[in-house]
């Protein structure tokens, strides 16, 4: 992909950061995150990513352009608080889709955590949903399932 204007949310995350860095070489990439770590922001900016501090839980995209070609939504919350995790993992995806309604494509990154654990069987898109992260992250699976419903 070259010459596109791309928004990447959760830009400081382990999945989004290498994608943002790679795409910034040939595109106008905007990275949205809380940017609580100044070094993470600096690394992205040095690669040419335009960084915008955004609190996805608040659903406020003021100051963030809407004229992107593509949105890659990698934002995630695993706080254990239902209000925050549903706001970030589900509600904000819908609000962001509305804010950037003219995009060519909106990629929403979900998680294998949305599936019911099938023992040793491989998972597919048709696998049954389930709350398989309850012991470790009690809000994660359900809030990610909610996000899939919002963007469907």
Report residues per predicted region.
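Conserved catalytic-core motifs of eukaryotic protein kinase domains, centered on the activation segment
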Residues: 42, 78-86, 117-121
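N-terminal Rossmann NAD(P)H-binding glycine-rich loop of SDR-like oxidoreductase domains
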Residues: 6-25
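NAD(P)-cofactor binding segment of oxidoreductase domains
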Residues: 70-71, 80-108, 150
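N-terminal Rossmann-fold cofactor-binding loop
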Residues: 32-38, 55
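NAD(P)H-binding glycine-rich loop region in Rossmannoid oxidoreductase-like domains
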Residues: 49-90
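SDR active-site strand-loop-helix element
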Residues: 9, 32, 71-74, 106-112
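Conserved Rossmann-fold NAD(P)-dependent oxidoreductase catalytic core, especially the SDR/UDP-sugar
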Residues: 94-139
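Active-site Tyr-X1-5-Lys
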Residues: 135-152
